[in-house]
A protein has these predicted regions:
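P-loop/Walker A NTP-binding module and the surrounding RecA-like catalytic core of P-loop NTPases
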Residues: 82, 111-342
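Non-catalytic terminal/linker segments enriched in charged/polar, low-complexity residues
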Residues: 1-128, 133-141, 163, 168, ...
Length: 342
């Protein structure tokens, strides 16, 4: 069973009427999902293409000058320097191969290259699967700086999972902030998840240990472990995350099965720095990029997944539970370039 199978409603828990309603909702989902994503990425799209329109205004062919301006457009859209250079070099290669390229083609060519980069980072599959063993909880350790939306992401994810009929345990292992524990408690109650907590200042690894023991004993399907996000002491952070991982592996061999880094997309280049520091501190296996609806900095999705070669699992495009969206690279590119129905 893969991670995404966890979101399928268990057959023995769904009444026929509920199943019919679920089927009706799913038939409406593709168009509605795309519309919501289009709206969520509108600021990024309008920012990118208004800059692009200005860059090619009055020009008919793609030459060195146009590519220089395109490079500036991508960098100021927070795609990142390394990824921007890669895109420009690929477009240069296409122009050299084709001998001639007009500016009217630039929109579709840029779309192709961004889609290609995302495919390289995510693989050819629509969703990347994970090897989840039957009979034991699937453990996700969630990392990220304070304020990135880590606690809210855990809460929304728990709500989605419990709504799909899964038993969810949450470990409040960010024991340095009372507010984080209290906020998680509210989300756990709202989602119908079980939360394991200790007093503020307790050993985070001890919280993780207790959470996994309880989850295993009670037949939980998924465990979500919150962690502290203090980057001012990277060595301390690395040691703490390593200790948590080692303790969890003693309870459930192979745990955590996923380490999810939550990044605030609205911070632009700061998100790159956070990704760099956390990937140095621990092995990160997936990304969640939040707050994309209120920013023109959505290019970070492209740049970070390309630079760090870590798949994006979720993006946040609003406050609602359903606006924490499983990332679909084709939907993302369609929304960014104003195309639907493909």
């Amino acid at each position: 069973m893969g991670f995404f199978d966890l979101f399928k409603k268990k057959q023995d828990t769904a009444a026929p009427q509920e199943a019919a309603q679920t089927e009706a909702r799913s038939s409406e989902a593709p168009a509605r999902r795309q519309e919501e994503l289009n709206a969520g990425l509108e600021k990024t799209k309008s920012g990118l293409f208004s800059k692009l329109a200005r860059a090619v205004a009055g020009r008919s062919t793609v030459d060195a000058s146009v590519l220089d301006d395109l490079e500036e457009v991508l960098i100021t859209s927070d795609v990142g320097v390394e990824t921007t250079v890669k895109i420009i070099e690929r477009i240069e290669a296409r122009a050299a191969r084709d001998k001639y390229m007009n500016t009217a083609e630039l929109h579709s060519i840029l779309r192709d290259e961004i889609a290609r980069l995302l495919e390289e980072a995510h693989g050819s599959a629509e969703n990347f699967g994970l090897d989840v063993r039957e009979g034991e909880p699937y453990v996700v350790m969630v990392v990220g700086v304070n304020g990135a939306g880590k606690t809210t992401t855990i809460g929304k994810l728990a709500a989605k999972l419990t709504r799909a009929g899964r038993k969810v345990w949450i470990g409040a292992a960010d024991t340095f902030r009372a507010a984080a524990i209290d906020q998680l408690g509210v989300w756990a109650e709202r989602a119908g998840a079980t939360m394991i907590r200790q007093e503020m200042g307790s050993d985070p690894a001890s919280v993780a240990f207790d959470t996994l023991k309880s989850a295993k004993a009670n037949g939980a399907d998924v465990v979500l472990i919150d962690t502290a996000g203090r980057l001012h002491n990277k060595i301390g952070l690395m040691n703490e995350l390593t200790k948590i991982r080692n303790v969890m592996a003693k309870v459930i061999p192979g745990a955590p099965h996923e380490v999810m880094l939550v990044l605030d997309g609205s911070t632009g280049q700061n998100a790159f720095e956070q990704a760099r520091q956390f990937t140095q501190a621990t092995q990160v296996t997936s990304l969640t990029i939040t707050k994309l609806d209120g920013t023109a900095k959505g290019g970070v999705v492209i740049g970070i997944s390309d630079r760090f070669r870590i798949p994006v699992r979720y993006i946040g495009i609003g406050e609602g539970i359903d606006q924490l969206r499983m990332f679909d690279r084709r939907e993302f590119v369609d929304a960014l370039f104003g195309e639907t129905g493909k």
